[in-house]
Amino acid sequence: MLSSLARVLQFGLLVFTSIFFLVDPLAAIPTFLVITAGADTGERRKTAKTAAFTCCVVLLGFAFAGTLIFRLFGITLVAFKIAGGVILMLIGLDMLRARRSPTKETLDETREGAEKENAGIIPLGIPMLAGPGSISTVMVLMGQSSEWWQTVCICIAVVITAVLSYWILAGADRVRRHLGDTGSRVLTRLMGLLLTAIAVQFILNGLADLGVVKSTK
């Protein structure tokens, strides 16, 4: 019983950290403040809620439609593991340098979003929160989940990440004030280090499935 609970907790923690670090709502704070400049508290909360809800729907949608997408385009899970790992590594390395990764969102997308009423959907919800890295991660995790509780863990992790993203964006002013620029950079680098390690593991798992390297599981 205890060993089973430990497995669930270990898997749940891995899934949550992978998804949360990729969604990275803390890194979205500067853009959120620019987009919502001049808005009152109610409007900011509404935008934050829209962004978080969009992120949740997109990630859950791709999580459950992943298998269908694989079949439709003839993509194997092994190929997606390796490709997803490469994307995660690029994002992680950019985070280690404490800079916004262009694989998540371009400057043009940020500028365009600032001029739109639905900025909570684009670019905040997509691609800032639900970007290529987080989408590919939930698809890979769901694709290699063989038991029902693993699927539940992934769904719960996505929902918790969306809720935390809302809280962080809704309180963007307070979060930025407490952390400061230096604190934000330090936290970003720590998250980047963990994300890079997860990316390496994704790639190793894919290579192990191909028989290129010995399994590390």
Place the predicted regions along the sequence by residue.
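Juxtamembrane transmembrane-helix termini in multi-pass membrane transport proteins
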Residues: F11-A63
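Membrane helix-loop-helix hairpins that form the core translocation module of multi-pass transporters
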Residues: K46-R99
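Interfacial loop-to-helix junctions that mark the boundaries of transmembrane helices
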Residues: M1-F16, R71-I82, S145-A157, V212-K217
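Generic transmembrane alpha-helix signature in multi-pass membrane proteins
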Residues: T17-F20, I29-I35, I122-P127, I135-Q144
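Transmembrane helix exit motif
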Residues: I87-E109, I198-D209
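Membrane-interface alpha-helices at helix entry/exit sites of multi-pass transporters
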Residues: D40-F53, W148-V159, R185-V186
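Transmembrane-helix boundary and interhelical-loop signature of multi-pass inner-membrane proteins
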Residues: D40-T41, G61-A83, L164-D209
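Small-residue-enriched transmembrane helix starts and helix-helix packing motifs
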Residues: M1-L22, A98, E105-G125
